[in-house]
Amino acid sequence: MASIAHCSGGLVGAGNFDFILGGSDPVGRHGLMELQPWHWCCLPLEGRTGSEIFSQLFGHQGIATLLESPYPASPDHPHLGRYSLCAGQPRKGRLWTPKPEEIFSFLNQLCPCNHDVNLTKNIPEHLPFHGGWLGWLGYDTAWAIEKLPYSKADDLPFPVAYWYEPENFVILDHQEQLLWLATTDQEKIKFFQTQLADKINSVSSPQVPPLNLTYTTDQDQYETMVNQAKQYIKAGDIFQANLTLRFIAKTEQKLNSWQVYQHLQTINPSPFASYWRSPWGDVVSCSPERLVKLEGNVAQTRPIAGTRARGKNLAEDEQLLQELLVNTKELAEHIMLVDLERNDLGRVCTWGTVEVDELLAIERYSHVSHLVSNVKGILQPDKTGVDLVKALFPGGTITGCPKIRCLEIIEELEPVRRSLFYGSCGYWDQRGNLDLNILIRTLLFTSGQVTGQVGAGIVADSDPAKEWLESLQKAKALLAALEGL
């Protein structure tokens, strides 16, 4: 089936989902509503990128999503670049923004194990998304999982959770060079084909005035936070914590978030990148990190811990990498967090199936290199994707170890709540498959400003000044995307 490169135009899938209409009713006042049948079309991809397809089909829509992996992928992670997904506006009534206490009630209703979903046999099973929901879980989702103190506020307008069912979507199979288009209206197939045939018009980048850049935490304040965290480590409360600082960039003219995303993907291509155009603002993320993936009954997480700046040349780059690989502080932090993820997966996976199938791998990006591992296991038969997300969220690499105590300390030390930063976004497929990143290397575009957040892992022998510099290094690619337009 994967070799087909023509339009079938047939009905190939239908199922049942709860009808969710915003707000405070995760179960759905309207009961079950049959999922409209999908009309599928398969076309040659012809080397086009996710960004190009998104621009052609959905770039004009007020609500739209792109989940993009660059292809060919980096030699450091060749298996992470096969698919991209882009989608337009939601089906009528199929957008939901819950309160934190409602999030998992909704996700349990969404989970296919609660519904008689009629899956198509005419579309390749390997495609990651056969229809379902796209969305995010902000950092505050942790408060729906654990009892945590409320002492800080989030002044950004984005809802804690946001999920919607798209009216039309496209899967790009970069490896097979095929484009799979799905729509609820068969007449839309010809319309989209016409759009895809049109030449892509390049958009000239405007001259952006100098950025007015401010940090909500200055160096002295951040180093004080680091020292306070080290006191908690010394007292035995925690072993490691991730502390962040927020920056805000303002200009006299509105920045084009889509141009920023494209520029950021050019200078810092990342396997879990995403672009969200939403009613509350735009989200630009070039995340290198996966929180969780579930495919069938195989669950996996891919923690990143350990960072070095890129060298000015190959020799310096290699020297910095070797320093990273023998640095006892970095290695201890990484292994500690891998163990945390093993334990989290072990809560919902079958005994004896959790394994580290990739340990201390190097992944290189435009401004930094990372140490990365991969942990996987077989989900227990009586567990669902909802249980898996609850076990892993938020990622241990952006909180610390032990996770709950670190969440409490972060709430105490950081001046503002994290909003979407360090939450997750991605897809939840109607078959039960899901793939969520961690929202790092992310910019939030709201009226009049762009906000970013970066941080570093703190351990007992951390140097506060070096942790400050590591955080700034992580911000460089984001700031370069803003300043380089």
From Swiss-Prot:
GO terms for biological process: L-tryptophan biosynthetic process. L-tryptophan binds at S69, P271, F272, A273. InterPro entries: ADC_synthase, Anth_synth_I-like, Anth_synth_I_N, Chorismate_C, Para-NH2Bz/anthranilate_synth. Keywords: Amino-acid biosynthesis, Aromatic amino acid biosynthesis, Lyase, Magnesium, Metal-binding, Tryptophan biosynthesis. It comes from the Bacteria. It catalyses: chorismate + L-glutamine = anthranilate + pyruvate + L-glutamate + H(+). Pathway: Amino-acid biosynthesis; L-tryptophan biosynthesis; L-tryptophan from chorismate: step 1/5. The keyword Amino-acid biosynthesis applies. Binds 1 Mg(2+) ion per subunit. Its cofactor is Mg(2+). Mg(2+) binds at E333, E470. GO terms for molecular function: anthranilate synthase activity; metal ion binding. Chorismate binds at G306, T307, R441, G455, A456, G457. Its EC number is 4.1.3.27. It holds the Pfam family Chorismate_bind. Component I catalyzes the formation of anthranilate using ammonia rather than glutamine, whereas component II provides glutamine amidotransferase activity. Belongs to the anthranilate synthase component I family. PANTHER family: ISOCHORISMATE SYNTHASE ENTC. NCBIfam families: PabB-clade2, PRK05940.1. Tetramer of two components I and two components II. This is Anthranilate synthase component I-like protein. It comes from Synechocystis sp. (strain ATCC 27184 / PCC 6803 / Kazusa).
